[in-house]
Amino acid sequence: MQFDEEWSKADPIVHALLHQKSVTPAAWQDLFYHVYKITSWVDDGPLKIRDILTRCINDYVHEANKRIRSLQTDGSLLIGYIKEWNRFYQQANILPLPFKKIDESSRRRSVPETPEESIRTVMLEKWNEIIFMNISEQLLVEALRLVKEERDGNIIDAQNVIGIRESFVALNDRAGEDPLLVYRQSFERQFIEQTTEYYKKICGNLLNELGVLEYMVYADKKLEEEQQRAKRYLEMNSPTSGKHMEKAVIALVESFEDTILAECSKLIASKDVERLQRLYRLIRRTRSGIDTVLKCIDTHIRTEGLNDMRNNAENLSTDPERYVQQLLLMFDKFSSLVREGFCDDARLLTARDKAFRAVVNDSSIFKTEMMNKKGRTLSVESKCAELLANYCDLLLRKTQLSKKLTSEEIDEKLNQVLLVLKYVENKDVFMRFHRAHLSRRLILEMSADQEKEEMMVTKLRECGMPSDAVNKLSRMLQDIELNKDMNSSFKKALTGTNNNKSIADSINMKVLNGGAWGRGGSERIRFSLPRELEDFVPEMEAFYKKQHNGRKLCWMHHWSSGTMVFGTANGGRFDLECTTFQMAVLFCFNDRAHDKISLETLRLATELPDAELNRTLLSLVAYPKMRYQILLCDVPSTTVTARDFTDSTKFLINHDFNVVKNGKSQQRGKVNLIGRLQLSLEANAEKEHESIVALRELRVQEGIVKILKTRKTYTLAQLTMELVEILKPLFIPNRKIIKEQIDWLIENKYMERRADDINTFVYIS
């Protein structure tokens, strides 16, 4: 087979393809056939094809070069080049297809160090060598002129710029070399430099002419345009493509960053969401501008939050519901600001959390002094934890609030409580008061919904409350369930013995675990039960010991309550819900309904300590929720207090007692005298705080010993940091309590200071 004869059949098709003339499918297939025959049957066929094809390509590129050179002006030169380049670049992807066998043969035959180039590479190199290398600078200048026109607002043919970019990339794609090196050194570099120079010239004057707010509109629009421009005209695979936007941001934003950021606080204060979004879009692109925005958000939330709380302090301090709703209202407002103005940026959300935590834990408005048993104030803390616990109690107890809410609404509000609790630092105070409220609800059977109580315990566990504290709450609920079965068994055992059927039906006892309920035998109080109840106690103890041998019962009379019928000489008949102490006092009047009984006599009859007796009597002679009181006394003062009582003070039944409803007196009704059931013998909230402080001191001691036992030797800074991390779920210990407990542990030989460094501690095993 002769090469010239066979190539003469392929040559017209090759020329037609190079000159973008029409080629039929049959001719296209014939080209593959002719190439195959030459490479298979002609000696050195692949080399001969490569040589003649290279000459054809060379001739065509020279012709294209003449056509391009015939155009004199730069604009015409660019247009002519792009026209020729687009046609040629298209053929550079089509023409090599029939010659793949040539490329494969060349690869098999070539030496690895000097591989022969593919047909496509030959085409691109010829174009680069004959045309592009000689006019690339002119083309680049013209392309950048078009980009400037576009920035000025004129409409251009973007394909002219894109074609130059493609030329810089495609014509320098050589094996073993960085294909984008020439592109970066020429096109990309000059494109970025032009961007910087363009905006440097105009931005300063524009800021003065437009003002800051309107300039922000301009800068935001231009940055968006530059981002789209980069996608069109730059090679996104280039590792330095991001420099274009960096330089644009510096020219448009960072150069005037302080001026723009000066508007941030004003926009936040005025809640101008649209402009805040614009400011955020600009500043988030800068290197450090967001830090100023974070400070502005922090200052705004702290200032506005504390001002709102201060302005409503008088109403909020005594109304837990309004207090919590005020916090939630603020949280929603600040969250909305971050969401709408700053697109929920994680950094802004963190700043919101930090500032809101400061508002929640602020002690300048709603404060509680935490004192130890020596009366020394260890810290002044926010009252938020206590008010949160009180609000929980309103939702979970049978109250007007819980009755008017649906089950779903109560669930939602409990979740809101947990949301606020997340920001509370002294969570141990919340847990202490929550347990006290739970105790009252369970003992008085005032829970609105047992399932809600269990759900709340589960949620506290899920939100990270310490397991030992949550386990105690869970055990309290279990005790109540277990007591239901025990009461049923006890009533069956009591019925029919000693004519006790009536008392069996009216008795409801609760045997509670001392560890879970937080009270033990140390709180037992000397007290003489009324004769109506004293026979019941030994029967109950005997019954319990039969079922649980070895367990000891400690009667907590100050936790007990009951309902008694109260009759007056005027025919009134009322059901009084009262504590055991109130019951004991009222039973003293059973046989002396019209007599005056002195305080000293009541003390002898009940054997109550003076403080408890005075408190009980005060609840019967000056109960704030009633117009008429159960007892009257001969204290001359119009506003009776426990301090007015003396041993000679006389008390008597008020036979004119009535219940007032809707302004009308009624001689029948149910009266609740229990109020806030006294679950401990402490006289006031200060004592409760003392017990919290005492528990904190123990936890700090335990934490320090645990850390030093592991570390053996630790500096004060390291010890403090790790201790705070351990105790953070319950409370954050301050320096004062840490220092005091370190001194105590040193004094009691648990640890010692290192001889050569007083700020380094050593564990004593």
Swiss-Prot record:
Every Cullin neddylation domain range: 696-757
PROSITE patterns: CULLIN_1 (PS01256), CULLIN_2 (PS50069)
Protein name from the UniProt record: Cullin-5
Species whose genome carries this gene: Caenorhabditis elegans
Keyword check for Ubl conjugation: yes
Ranges annotated as spanning the membrane: none
Classification via PANTHER family: CULLIN
Stored SMART domains: CULLIN, Cullin_Nedd8
PTM comment, free text: Neddylated; which enhances the ubiquitination activity of SCF-like complex.
Keywords: Isopeptide bond, Ubl conjugation, Ubl conjugation pathway
Family of this protein: Belongs to the cullin family.
Assembly with partners or alone: Interacts with rbx-1 and rbx-2.
GO cellular component: Cul5-RING ubiquitin ligase complex; SCF ubiquitin ligase complex
Keyword Ubl conjugation: yes
GO biological process, one term: protein ubiquitination
